[in-house]
Amino acid sequence: MHSRPLPTLGRHAARSVLNSPNFFIGNRAYPLKSSVGAKAILYTAGILGGAFAGYYLFNARSAIHEYLLCPILRLATPDAENGHRAGIFCLKWGLAPKLLFDEDDEVLHVNVFGTKMTNPIGCAAGLDKDAEAIDGIMQGGFGYMEIGSVTPLPQPGNPKPRFFRLPQDDAVINRYGFNSSGHDAVYSNLSKRVTSFLKSYFAKDNEIDKLSLYKNKLLAINLGKNKTGDEVKDYLKGVEKFQSHADVLVINVSSPNTPGLRDLQNESKLTDLLSQIVQKRNSLIQNGNVLGAKTHKPPVLVKIAPDLTEPELESIAVAAKKSKVDGIIVSNTTIQRPDSLVTRDEALKSQTGGLSGKPLKPFALKALKTVYKYTKDSELVLVGCGGISSGQDAIEFAKAGATFVQLYTSYAYKGPGLIAHIKDEVTEELKKEGKTWNQIIGEDSK
């Protein structure tokens, strides 16, 4: 079929428009006095378009991260550990999105360790093992950030592959085995960050007195032991090395990937270990911290496994009370493989290591409820961790006894926007109930 030629008048009109010195919006013509004007409009449109695209790309609330960028990253990195490293690289160098206009609603504020933390959503240990990307992660909206685990000496961890995705379950299995750059390297990273802060304009803000370097947000350092290290001395070395840099110190005795580590959860061993750690912490109080405080007494938390019986959890509560630590994180990864797993690849889901993500939630929540049963009459702070991926999950953990919560695996799957979505969901639900976060802590047991 032959195309129909333009009528004579139409051809003249078309040429007139194409050669017109006017810029058209709809049927209205705006005169362009020169090609310079045309270029200016095009450049302006390009700049505005680029600015909008940049704002969308670097705004943590954008859905593009969960539905496009994170899936692309997973496709580009079949080896999950390479994906982890790529994520840390982006967070470290400012290539990750930030939560713009991050002002938390008052209903999210939580009183913990003498601080009114801006929100109860924390980043769990394991994401940033070597303190490389603290700011990139904190700027996503967390109220609490935990680095590590950090071991005294550098160690490579277990042989690769050691990190596996179960995307159908929003879960991962890891057997990293405390791979760590060691105390000195992590201390150097932390010191450089503090030095840079003290030289900056923000150091003049007297309200920033937390070692996170963010107002009313906390930085925790998770301490581990070397594979062949002494089960007490390694932790004491960590306290001595990092007390001046940490708002909170965490003692990890629950990783399933270091031989014999979970044996430290035995009541007598745990009481002895934690008592010595608290004594070491107390002996260093007068040394102050790197921000110039004359005294500094970071709370000590112990992180436990979910794979414990009620009597074992009760004995941990007893050890925590006897040793006078400040709280318990419930929980680490699980060595169980629940029947609820959607993944059908037996070789994949039977990989040795700790399972985290959505399938961990029922185990962690059950353990938390049990620990709260034996600690609610004390001043111990409980931290909920395991399978949290929504505002409703966070609220469940709070009502079960958690003062605040932590997550990691869901953040890796859904991207930085998850934190804003969780905070929005929690805020909406709390306002619907006419309550604050502080008011719902332990509500299920009242």
UniProtKB/Swiss-Prot annotation:
The active site is at residue 255. One of its GO terms (biological process) is 'de novo' pyrimidine nucleobase biosynthetic process. It is a single-pass membrane protein. CDD domains: DHOD_2_like (cd04738). Substrate binds at residues 129, 174-178, 252-257, 332-333. Keywords: Flavoprotein, FMN, Membrane, Mitochondrion, Mitochondrion inner membrane, Oxidoreductase, Pyrimidine biosynthesis, Transit peptide, Transmembrane, Transmembrane helix. It catalyses: (S)-dihydroorotate + a quinone = orotate + a quinol. Pathway: Pyrimidine metabolism; UMP biosynthesis via de novo pathway; orotate from (S)-dihydroorotate (quinone route): step 1/1. Binds 1 FMN per subunit. PROSITE patterns: DHODEHASE_1, DHODEHASE_2. The activity is dependent of the presence of oxygen. S.kluyveri has two isoforms of DHODase, a cytoplasmic isoform and a mitochondrial isoform. Belongs to the dihydroorotate dehydrogenase family. Type 2 subfamily. This is Dihydroorotate dehydrogenase (quinone), mitochondrial.
